[in-house]
Amino acid sequence: MSEAYFRVESGALGPEENFLSLDDILMSHEKLSVRTEIPMPRLGAFFLDRSGGAETDNAIPEGTKLELPLWLAKGLFDNKRRILSVELPKIYQEGWRTVFSADANVVDLHKMGPHFYGFGSQLLHFDSPENADISHSLLQTFVGRFRRIMDSSQNAYNEDTSALVARLDEMERGLFQTGQKGLNDFQCWEKGQASQLTASNLVQNYAKRKFTDMED
């Protein structure tokens, strides 16, 4: 019997991801462009293209460009040894930061990066000289979009919000859903439904499991 899934909050805005969070697991698998700064022995078989049947050794040469998942790039990055350097994704570079500072609401964040804030926060791990600008841009983008998101969640009761939600990153979608739930709870309170006691999902699921066990 399937169990209810209780969403675990993301930890990506902090120093480390929360690997009990599905959002963080998905975010940590997004690809990041890197360049090797030293040869990497015995790793070529895993990362280099073997098409064409070319014979190569198992080392990744210095200067090789790779697409690595975020979790692996973080694990290999070391300031002291300079194992690899990271190329900032375009959406975090100066050109896009200028767009965000002009009007962050015009950008389809989900299309550009479904975990825009979480992924951007984890990029600060790589000690780029642009880190201060990136963190400032992330904060200002969130502030610039927050009011519209919450206003829409509070003024779109029983309306089709799919077009708006489709443009939000995953964290923004969570905020929108929270706003919608608050509005729905308020509407229930106004109708006098808030005083009605209902069993929690945990109790209902437990009762279903117990009934199923009795049938078996």
Swiss-Prot record:
Q: What InterPro entries does the database record attribute to this sequence? A: GINS_A, GINS_bundle-like_dom_sf, GINS_Psf3, GINS_Psf3_sf, PSF3_N
Please give the biological process terms from Gene Ontology that the record holds: cellular senescence; mitotic DNA replication initiation; multicellular organism growth
- Entry-linked CDD domains: GINS_A_psf3, GINS_B_Psf3
Q: Which residues form a coiled coil?
A: none
Pfam families, per database record: PSF3_N, Sld5
Main localization of the protein?
nucleus
Which Gene3D superfamilies does the entry link to?
1.20.58.2050
Q: Which UniProt keywords apply?
A: Chromosome, DNA replication, Nucleus
Q: Which domain of life is it from?
A: Eukaryota
Which GO CC annotations does the UniProt entry carry? CMG complex; GINS complex
Q: What is the protein's quaternary organization? A: Component of the GINS complex which is a heterotetramer of GINS1, GINS2, GINS3 and GINS4. Forms a stable subcomplex with GINS2. GINS complex interacts with DNA primase in vitro. Component of the CMG helicase complex, a hexameric ring of related MCM2-7 subunits stabilized by CDC45 and the tetrameric GINS complex.
The family annotation for this protein states: Belongs to the GINS3/PSF3 family.
Q: What does this protein do?
A: Required for correct functioning of the GINS complex, a complex that plays an essential role in the initiation of DNA replication, and progression of DNA replication forks. GINS complex is a core component of CDC45-MCM-GINS (CMG) helicase, the molecular machine that unwinds template DNA during replication, and around which the replisome is built.
PANTHER family xref list: DNA REPLICATION COMPLEX GINS PROTEIN PSF3 (PTHR22768:SF0)
The protein's name is: DNA replication complex GINS protein PSF3
